[in-house]
């Protein structure tokens, strides 16, 4: 029997720096097999150094991470798909109790950040509950397949708008404990692991959504026709009259356009072009047995997930040469109801 040594070469006959470049070319869909080659390979594939080598050689891959909820609503877990639609397994659940009204974003291209939300606490009355907002923030690093707790927000909040702009994470408005409406915002700097409170226009809106465009933060409040635009360079807000009021419950951004599901437009997918300040919509195929509930993005295409577990996912093809159209996405088949999805590069 050959005993492995920690100093054994990654590939016999090659220096480790050359061998690392070779191994970094292996697609992640093959990691389960290649990690069984030897202990040295397994250790290298799971290391932060391996992730750095892949980034250096430009061999990072894009993965769709889907947060799902079981039918009973008690179990929440993540499933991961690669660019070909291969299901690569699950990532560990977010620490702490199950939350609603949370935010999920991606920083540094490959780290998932889960922040805020609320839990329900039983009240003293019959069938009564109170809402407890959370300021907790957790970060998932795919290099070591684990979560770690980051600095918490200054104010616990849920049902807020959020977006990443130039590497910084912004959360806007929302609600705190006892459904107290918030009229401020916060910004997180991952380099310093600090949150800073910031002013934002006070609008009586219900959640809404936010996105980045031209290095600026766009905040759209449900029930308001005004869009608040924040310029990080000048640290100032400006107001844009979009001339349309929305009630958005799910959205995604593809090719600098915002696609959204609006309670006021059943059977339609809304489209907002921030460059033209124009609104439009496209037909959404009806779904027997339930409503479309969440949007996502994969391979530069809009994904439409069903509320009902086991039903297929639809994909909206934005390729103008082929003509935009809906078709069934056979590759992406989540095993439960989708709550959120993000893309990471790793």
From Swiss-Prot:
Q: Any idea what this protein is called?
A: Putative F-box/kelch-repeat protein At1g27420
Q: Where is the F-box domain?
A: 9-56
Keywords on this record? Kelch repeat, Repeat
Specify the superkingdom: Eukaryota
Q: Which CDD domains match?
A: F-box_AtAFR-like (cd22152)
The record's InterPro entries line, in alphabetical order, gives:
F-box-like_dom_sf, F-box_dom, Kelch-typ_b-propeller, Kelch_1
Q: Which Pfam families match?
A: F-box, Kelch_FKB95
Q: Which SUPFAM superfamilies match?
A: F-box domain, Kelch motif
Entry annotated with the keyword Zinc-finger:
no
Give residue ranges of the Kelch repeats: 62-109, 111-167, 168-215, 217-257, 259-300
């Amino acid at each position: 029997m050959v005993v492995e040594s920690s100093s054994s070469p990654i590939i016999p006959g090659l220096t480790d720096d050359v061998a690392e470049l070779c191994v970094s070319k292996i697609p992640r869909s093959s990691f389960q097999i290649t990690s069984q080659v030897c202990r040295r390979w397994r250790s290298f594939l799971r290391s932060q150094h391996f992730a750095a080598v892949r980034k250096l050689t430009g061999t990072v891959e894009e993965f769709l991470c889907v947060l799902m909820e079981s039918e009973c609503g008690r179990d929440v877990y993540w499933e991961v798909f690669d660019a070909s639609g291969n299901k690569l397994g699950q990532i560990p659940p977010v620490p702490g109790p199950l939350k609603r009204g949370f935010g999920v974003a991606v920083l540094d291209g490959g780290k998932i950040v889960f922040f805020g939300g609320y839990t329900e606490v039983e009240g003293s009355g019959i069938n009564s509950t109170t809402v407890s907002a959370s300021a907790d923030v957790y970060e998932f690093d795919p290099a070591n397949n684990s979560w770690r707790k980051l600095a918490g927000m200054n104010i616990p909040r849920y049902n807020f708008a959020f977006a990443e702009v130039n590497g910084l994470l912004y959360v806007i408005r929302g609600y705190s404990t006892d459904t107290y409406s918030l009229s401020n915002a916060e910004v997180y700097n991952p380099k310093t692991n600090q949150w800073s409170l910031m002013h934002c226009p006070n609008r009586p809106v219900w959640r809404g959504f936010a996105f980045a465009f031209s290095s600026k933060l766009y905040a759209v409040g449900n029930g308001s026709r005004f869009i608040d635009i924040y310029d990080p360079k000048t640290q100032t807000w400006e107001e844009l009259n979009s001339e349309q009021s929305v009630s958005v419950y799910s959205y995604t951004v593809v090719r600098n356009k915002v696609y959204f599901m609006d309670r006021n437009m059943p059977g339609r997918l809304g489209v907002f072009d921030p460059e033209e300040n124009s609104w439009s919509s496209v037909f959404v195929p009806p779904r027997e047995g339930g409503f479309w509930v969440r949007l996502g993005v994969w391979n530069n295409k809009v994904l439409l997930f069903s509320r009902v577990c086991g039903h297929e996912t639809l994909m909206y093809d934005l390729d103008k040469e082929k003509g935009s159209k809906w078709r069934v996405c056979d590759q992406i088949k989540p095993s439960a109801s989708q709550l959120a999805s993000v893309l990471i590069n790793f």
